A protein has these predicted regions:
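A conserved hydrophobic position in a structured secondary element of the catalytic/binding core
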Residues: 8, 93, 139
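Unchanged
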Residues: 13-136, 145-146, 150-169
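N-terminal strand-loop-strand
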Residues: 1-19
Length: 169
């Protein structure tokens, strides 16, 4: 668990995901990713087109290995917090805001004698209930950074700007 950190929906592969994967001829990671998105946001999976998977990445703090599954939300539907034990906010952030160099810096957190640094994105969510400003950092920011680099969308930003990672959202 990475409480307080902005993150994409996700979690472990459940045993029933394997059966669905075999039935549908779809990779198990994709089945699990859609199931988690439904469980955590109420997303209608029929409106999502799976584009592919990124290479598996280590999650250093918890020693998990994560395979990000990328999807295009082709037919957006209403989403929201389904379980407050899992999520506090479902935020929709425009990609242009994530790419804006003014919204980027390097976040760091010290654990003992080790300092961990990750890319970070300052973002604003303006929902029907409130305007919320927060920092996307850690694993989620690393994934976003890798996606933008792979797509050659990254706009040069000053990675030497260091800010402490927030304690929570």
């Amino acid at each position: 668990s990475h409480a307080g950190q902005p993150a994409f929906p996700g979690g472990k592969i459940d045993p029933e995901d394997y059966a669905l994967s075999r039935q549908q001829g779809v990779p198990v990671g994709r089945i699990a990713a859609l199931r988690e998105a439904v469980e955590e946001t109420g997303l209608d999976p029929a409106g999502v087109e799976i584009l592919g998977e990124l290479p598996t990445l280590p999650l250093a703090v918890s020693d998990f290995r994560v395979t990000p599954v990328l999807g295009w939300w082709a037919s957006p539907t209403r989403v929201g917090v389904v379980d407050t034990n899992e999520s506090a906010l479902i935020a929709r952030v425009p990609v242009r805001d994530l790419l804006n160099p003014a919204n980027r810096h390097t976040a760091y957190v010290k654990r003992g004698r080790i300092t961990h640094k990750t890319p970070a994105f300052e973002v604003v969510h303006s929902g029907s209930d409130a305007r919320v400003e927060f920092t996307v950092w850690g694993f989620t920011a690393i994934v976003l950074d890798k996606i933008f680099d792979a797509l050659t969308w990254t706009v040069p930003w000053d990675a030497s700007v260091l800010k402490p990672a927030p304690a929570s959202v």
